[in-house]
C-alpha cells in the first residue's frame, strides 16, 4: 500500500511514525521493503553523498537527480523532497517553480521547508498550489551560519516559546507534519502534545510522534574520521564491511582466484579448436 499524506496524519496518536533518508534507487527499495513510513530525500546528501562540508552547496538540479532515483524505486513509503538552500528563500515565484519540479519531474509526494514564521508566505503558496509541505524547526542546518554552527535550539524559556509558536503557526498554515531537530526533549514533547499534526524528531528525544535518522549514520556507512552526533544510534557497520569486501576482491584477483570457472563462459570444443586454428593462420 502506498502511504499518503492523510495516512501519515492519521498515525498521530496511534503508533510511532518511521522516517529515513534515501538518496538512490537501491536504498529506496530497501527502505520501502522495511516498511518505513516516510522516505526523506534530504539535502544531507550534500555531505554524505557528495562530500560537501555542509548542506548549503547542493542545488535543485542535484537534489532532483536523487529524488528521481528514489521515486524510480516506486516505494510504498511517502517520498518527501528536501528543498535546498536558496530554492525557497528569494521569492514566492521561484519557490513555487522549484517545489513544482520536485513534484512534477521528481514525482515526490511532498516537499520539506526549513523555518517558521518567515516561511509562512512561501508555505501558503505551496499549499495553494496543491503541494503538501513538511515543516522543519529547531536546529535547521541551512541556518547554521546564523546559529553559529550546529547548536541545540530552544534551551531558554524565550527560545522554547518561539519554537512552540512557530510550530503552531506551521500547523495553522497547513503543514502536514513538522521535523523537530536538535531541541531539548521536554520542548519537543510539549510541542508534540499540543499539535494535531505529527512531529518527527531527530535529536529531540523520544516523545515526538516519529523519528528520523540519516541512513549513512544508521548503517555506519561513514569513514573513521566522522564522529557521530549524540542522537545517532548505529545499527550496522557498512563502511567497514564494504572495505573488507574490497580488500578480499583485490586479493582474489591478484592471486588469480577470481574469476573462477563458475564465473566464466565457455564455448563448444569444436569452435574452440577452430578459433585456435584461425589464430595460427
Q: Where are the language model's segments positioned?
A:
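Alpha/beta enzyme core
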Residues: 2-236, 240-281
Amino acid at each position: 500500500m502506498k502511504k499518503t499524506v492523510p495516512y501519515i496524519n492519521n498515525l498521530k496518536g496511534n503508533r510511532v511514525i518511521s522516517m529515513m533518508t534515501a538518496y538512490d534507487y537501491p536504498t529506496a527499495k530497501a527502505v520501502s521493503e522495511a516498511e518505513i513510513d516516510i522516505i526523506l530525500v534530504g539535502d544531507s546528501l550534500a555531505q554524505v553523498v557528495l562530500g560537501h562540508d555542509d548542506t548549503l552547496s547542493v542545488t535543485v538540479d542535484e537534489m532532483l537527480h536523487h529524488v528521481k532515483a528514489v521515486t524510480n524505486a516506486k516505494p510504498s513509503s511517502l517520498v518527501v523532497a528536501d528543498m535546498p538552500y536558496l530554492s525557497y528563500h528569494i521569492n514566492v515565484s521561484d519557490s513555487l517553480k522549484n517545489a513544482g519540479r520536485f513534484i512534477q519531474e521528481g514525482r515526490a509526494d511532498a516537499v520539506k521547508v526549513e523555518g517558521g514564521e518567515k516561511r509562512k508566505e512561501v508555505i501558503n503558496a505551496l499549499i495553494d498550489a496543491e503541494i503538501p509541505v513538511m515543516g522543519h524547526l529547531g536546529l535547521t542546518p541551512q541556518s547554521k551560519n546564523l546559529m553559529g554552527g550546529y547548536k541545540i535550539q530552544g534551551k531558554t524559556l524565550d527560545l522554547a516559546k518561539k519554537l512552540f509558536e512557530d510550530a503552531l503557526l506551521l500547523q495553522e498554515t497547513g503543514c502536514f507534519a513538522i521535523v523537530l531537530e536538535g531541541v531539548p526533549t521536554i520542548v519537543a514533547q510539549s510541542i508534540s502534545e499540543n499539535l494535531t499534526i505529527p512531529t518527527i524528531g531527530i535529536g529531540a528525544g523520544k516523545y515526538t510522534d516519529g523519528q528520523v535518522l540519516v541512513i549513512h549514520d544508521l548503517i555506519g556507512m561513514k569513514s573513521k574520521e566522522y564522529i557521530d552526533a549524540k542522537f545517532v544510534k548505529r545499527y550496522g557497520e557498512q563502511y567497514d564491511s564494504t572495505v573488507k569486501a574490497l580488500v578480499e576482491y583485490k586479493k582474489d584477483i591478484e592471486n588469480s582466484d577470481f574469476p573462477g570457472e563458475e564465473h566464466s563462459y565457455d564455448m563448444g570444443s569444436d569452435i574452440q579448436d577452430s578459433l585456435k586454428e584461425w589464430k595460427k593462420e
